[in-house]
Each structure stands twice: as structure tokens, then as C-alpha cells.
């Protein structure tokens, strides 16, 4: 594994958002920010749910840059966060960029963490960390989508590296701890790695139930076998696992749009299962 150089030569972007239930709505009651990470004012296409767009630096992330994102959802609050576009990690001359996400949801709180994909350019060096802290009565659905190289341009991730660590805890009990290490094209080719697929996605859902798991398994089977046009002709791989009340869906593919379509479909039906109706899909995804 190459040495990770966390040089301070880049800029620091740090944002903390605190959501609370106020009357019938969820409000962004406090924010702290340093650097170019920012949010638009929350809006309410659905009653009681604060939709928020997290705006990443428009110029992308370069070596030495640090992004820190902290989200706190109080009891009975309900927040949905997404991004207006992909987060791009550009080539590095030696310093490692980092993105750290800390997501906390209290009792009866509800967080939907739905960012668009990360794109890692060849020769980029990046370190990703995600820490999710949930109360046992919280609801959480979140995903991460990572693209190594730019397959649409036949550009492969020949050099560089990306490391990742995701921890999910419920009432301070660790349910999931997994790491990712991608070191150029060799790891993408390896059968124990990504099997020649340049895109890797993970979708996390808590709490799980047998009924919800069965519903999502059926959706995956129907979409892959009966609607292949939805997922393109690149033969993606998608599977679902239950871990101590947490559902984990993993996806390997060649294109962003099919992965987004898959995860969006599973998210919408999960929300319907929990709340009895389909959600309003963020309009920014259609632009």
C-alpha cells in the first residue's frame, strides 16, 4: 500500500448541519461551515421532510484537499440530502485528498443520504471515511457510488489509489465495518476485487425486516431479469445481504445511470414500505 500523504497544502472544507422537528416540519436549526462546502436553503416538496442540496466545490477535489461533512438529525426530524452533481477527485502530484462523513440520527429520526457519485480520475489519491451513528429506533437509508476512471471515455484508473472505511453503529454497537482499497487497474481487474467493473456502489438500509428484504430482492430480480433495458447491456452485478438488522445492497457496473436507476428504485420502494407512499424524487437528478 502506498504511503498516504495528508499534506495541508490543499484547502479545508468543513460543514456541520443540525436538523430538528419544529411543529409539522423539519428545520435546519444550526449550521457551521468553513470553506467552499455549503447548502441551499432547505425546501419542502413533501410535508415535514427537509430536502437539502449539499454543494460541493465546483472545481472538484485535488491533492491535499479535505472535505468534512457532519449531519445530525434530532428525534422525529426527517431530512433528505443529495448533491447536484458528481464529486470529482482529480489527478494528484503526491498529496492525498480526503472526504470524511459523520452521520448521526437520534431516536425516531429519519435520514436519507443520497449523494451523486464520486469520480476518481487516473492518478488521483483519495481517502474516504464514513461513520454512521444510529439510535435503535432511527431510520436510515444511504448510498455511496464510486467510479474509477471515466469509462464513458474509455479512460481507465491506471494509476493512483483510493482507500475507504465505512462504519455503521446502532446504539454504539458496531454492525458493519468495511474497508476499500483500490490501487490502479490491477485491483479493478482482480476477481476478488471488482471483476473488471469500474463502478462500485453500496446502499445501506436500517432497520431491516423480512418483508422489506423480500420486497427488495424481488425488485432486484425483476429489474435485472425482466427489464434489462433499465440497466443497459453491460451485465452489472447486484446482490443484497442482511447483517444484524442492516440491509446492504452492493452493485458492480460500467455506467452511472443504471446504478443510479437501481438504487433510486430500491430507495423509493423502501420509503413506500416505511411510510406508505412513494417519495418525491429530487428534481436535481433530472438535470
Curated annotation (Swiss-Prot):
<dbReference type="Pfam" id="PF01774">
    <property type="entry name" value="UreD"/>
</dbReference>
<dbReference type="InterPro" id="IPR002669">
    <property type="entry name" value="UreD"/>
</dbReference>
<comment type="function">
    <text>Required for maturation of urease via the functional incorporation of the urease nickel metallocenter.</text>
</comment>
<comment type="subunit">
    <text>UreD, UreF and UreG form a complex that acts as a GTP-hydrolysis-dependent molecular chaperone, activating the urease apoprotein by helping to assemble the nickel containing metallocenter of UreC. The UreE protein probably delivers the nickel.</text>
</comment>
<dbReference type="GO" id="GO:0005737">
    <property type="term" value="C:cytoplasm"/>
</dbReference>
<comment type="similarity">
    <text>Belongs to the UreD family.</text>
</comment>
<keyword id="KW-0996">Nickel insertion</keyword>
<keyword id="KW-0143">Chaperone</keyword>
<dbReference type="GO" id="GO:0016151">
    <property type="term" value="F:nickel cation binding"/>
</dbReference>
<protein>
    <recommendedName>
        <fullName>Urease accessory protein UreD</fullName>
    </recommendedName>
</protein>
<keyword id="KW-0963">Cytoplasm</keyword>
Amino acid at each position: 500500500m502506498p504511503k498516504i500523504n495528508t499534506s495541508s497544502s490543499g484547502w479545508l472544507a468543513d460543514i456541520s448541519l443540525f436538523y430538528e422537528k419544529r411543529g409539522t416540519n423539519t428545520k435546519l436549526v444550526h449550521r457551521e461551515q468553513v470553506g467552499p462546502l455549503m447548502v441551499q436553503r432547505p425546501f419542502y416538496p413533501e410535508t415535514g421532510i427537509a430536502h437539502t442540496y449539499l454543494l460541493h466545490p465546483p472545481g472538484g477535489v485535488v491533492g491535499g484537499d479535505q472535505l468534512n461533512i457532519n449531519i445530525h438529525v434530532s428525534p422525529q426530524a426527517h431530512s433528505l440530502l443529495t448533491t447536484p452533481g458528481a464529486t470529482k477527485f482529480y489527478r494528484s502530484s503526491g498529496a492525498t485528498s480526503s472526504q470524511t462523513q459523520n452521520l448521526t440520527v437520534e431516536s425516531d429520526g429519519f435520514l436519507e443520504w443520497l449523494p451523486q457519485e464520486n469520480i476518481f480520475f487516473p492518478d488521483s489519491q483519495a481517502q474516504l471515511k464514513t461513520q454512521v451513528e444510529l439510535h435503535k429506533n432511527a431510520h436510515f437509508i444511504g448510498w455511496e457510488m464510486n467510479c474509477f476512471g471515466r469509462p464513458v471515455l474509455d479512460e481507465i484508473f491506471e494509476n493512483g489509489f483510493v482507500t475507504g472505511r465505512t462504519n455503521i453503529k446502532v446504539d454504539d454497537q458496531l454492525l458493519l465495518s468495511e474497508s476499500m482499497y483500490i490501487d490502479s487497474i490491477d485491483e479493478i481487474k482482480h476477481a476478488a476485487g471488482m471483476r473488471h467493473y469500474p463502478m462500485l456502489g453500496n446502499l445501506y438500509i436500517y432497520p431491516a425486516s423480512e418483508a422489506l428484504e423480500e420486497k427488495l430482492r424481488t425488485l432486484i430480480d425483476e429489474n435485472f431479469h425482466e427489464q434489462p433495458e433499465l440497466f443497459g447491456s453491460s451485465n452489472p452485478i447486484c446482490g443484497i445481504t442482511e447483517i444484524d438488522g442492516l440491509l446492504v445492497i452492493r452493485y458492480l457496473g460500467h455506467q452511472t445511470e443504471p446504478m443510479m436507476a437501481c438504487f433510486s428504485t430500491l430507495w423509493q420502494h423502501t420509503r413506500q414500505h416505511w411510510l406508505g407512499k412513494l417519495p418525491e424524487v429530487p428534481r436535481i437528478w433530472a438535470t
